[in-house]
Amino acid sequence: MRFGAWYPLSAAGDLSPEGEGVLQLRLATGLVDYPHGKSAMVWYQHARELRTAARALAVRFADKDLVCRHLIDVDAAVDLAAFCAKLREDFERRFGRVPELEP
C-alpha cells in the first residue's frame, strides 16, 4: 500500500475513489510549526465512503490552499481505520501534537 500523487483538495471529489479509504491533506505551500519540527501535513482521515468525505473536506477547507492524496494499491486484508490511527499516532509522536487542522 502506498499513497498516490497529490492533487488540489478542490478536485478531491472527482479524483478520490469511492468506497473505504484513507486520505491525507497538506499545505500546498509552506510548513506548520509543530512543537518538535515542521511539516506541511495537516489532516489524516479514514472514511467508509472516501469520495463523500473528500467532498466534505473540500467544502470545509475551501478557504485554505490544501492538496490531498489517498491510498492506492490497498491491501484488502489491512484494517484501514487502524492504519490511519497509526499514521496519526506516529505523527503526534514525531511532531509533538496532532496535525494542525484536526480537532
Enumerate the language-model features and the residues they cover.
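A short hydrophobic beta-strand segment most commonly corresponding to one strand
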Residues: 66-74
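Conserved micro-motifs of the catalytic ATP-binding
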Residues: 96
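GIY-YIG nuclease catalytic motif and its immediate N-terminal context
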Residues: 1-57, 74-93, 101-103
